[in-house]
């Protein structure tokens, strides 16, 4: 197995693990829980998810052609707890992850790490569905 294939498999598995952990955590929370904070200096789950999503969108959009932080990102706005429901929280969460996952679906990235189309198809299916 080529090193590019091994590397991508490890990266994909790690991202899947992090997303699954987040999914399971959010699933256990009530509508009220997503806004709970320990004190005025801490952030709610809603704010943390909003910030993580904003970070993923900023960092993974045009990942190979532009540098990290994008000019259109309003990072300070991510720390305002204005998510109105758990379903909205999930839409924000999924939006960030979709940008990250779509990055791994680009033919250019596939060619950079030297994956065959057959190997990539298998990897892509596991990334999307598991």
Locate each region found by the language model:
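Histidine-centered divalent metal-coordination motifs
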Residues: 51
């Amino acid at each position: 197995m080529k090193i590019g294939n091994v590397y991508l498999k490890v990266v994909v598995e790690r991202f899947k693990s992090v997303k699954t952990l987040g999914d399971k955590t959010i699933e256990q929370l009530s509508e009220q829980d997503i806004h709970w904070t320990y004190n005025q200096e801490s952030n709610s789950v809603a704010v943390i998810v909003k910030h993580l999503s904003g970070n993923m969108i900023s960092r993974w959009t045009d990942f190979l052609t532009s540098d990290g932080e994008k000019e259109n990102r309003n990072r300070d706005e991510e720390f305002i707890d204005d998510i109105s429901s758990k379903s909205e929280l999930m839409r924000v969460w999924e939006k960030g992850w979709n940008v990250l996952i779509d990055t791994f679906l680009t033919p250019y990235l596939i060619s950079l790490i030297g994956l065959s189309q057959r190997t990539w198809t298998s990897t892509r299916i596991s990334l999307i569905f598991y």
